[in-house]
Amino acid sequence: RDKDIVRCLRCFTCMAERAATSTRRCTVNPLIGRELEGDEIQPAPVKKKVLVAGGGPGGLYAAWTAARRGHQVILCEKEEELGGILKSEIAIPFKKEMYQLTETYARFARQSGVEIRLGCEVTPEYVEKEAPDALIIAVGSRPLVPPIPGIKGENVIIVNELYKNQDRVADKVAVMGGGLAGCECAIHLGMEGKEVHLIEMRDELAVDANVRHRPLLLKEIEKYVHVHAGCRVEEVTADGVRCRDKDGNELMVGAQTVICALGQRGRTDVVEA
């Protein structure tokens, strides 16, 4: 039974929504705050063939929901592993619930009869071949990697790929990007005893964190991370990151490893194809 429990992510969405909108919401339980609206899942009047493109949390949940409604569901994931962006959370111990959510949704989908095809990319030709009655596109996003000189150097790791490259992270690290992902990555590396420098071009950090989570996050940043706010990255070198602050002064942040956490961009090109 333990494996059938959708566990709390400790994401603070429930408390943040209460403060912001006077409602209750939950990242993993869509019934929270909607208890009077009736059952979430209703049997479909007609069974259809549904093709889901993408094996991240969104695709898995959509496939599971469609299967519970009685549809024939095929889920395709182009990688050899399910999880989407949540695969990267396995690198950070205090984010393990995020990674476990993928495992839970995958188990539910399989138990509901969803056919999962790994290493299978959905293309227009593939859709034509399968001829589904409905196509759900849940291909997620890709890391935003601006054309900064040196950003493709051997000492640079994209934050989404950290879980596969932890042995490459040296003792002195610069994290580019002070959003939620960059901040959490920096805290984790700081907890491991590394010297971590966080570079953010805005004056504030983690502006994408919710109102309850952010204050706690900033306290951990103070404990473990050297912050360089208001600094724009101009170049990545073998010695670290060259930046410029808002007054025009040049700053060199020394680092052996550079983590790129400059955001995500929706894969709209896949949708439009």
Task: Go through each PLM region and give its residues.
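Repeat-solenoid scaffold signature
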Residues: 1, 108-119, 125
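Flavin-dependent oxidoreductase catalytic cores
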Residues: 1-52, 57, 62-68, 169
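Rossmann-like dinucleotide/flavin-binding elements
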Residues: 44-77, 82, 117-131, 138-155, ...
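Rossmann-like dinucleotide-binding cores of NAD(P)H-dependent redox enzymes
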Residues: 72-112, 188-231
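Short, hydrophobic/aromatic-rich segments at coil-to-beta transitions
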Residues: 238-241
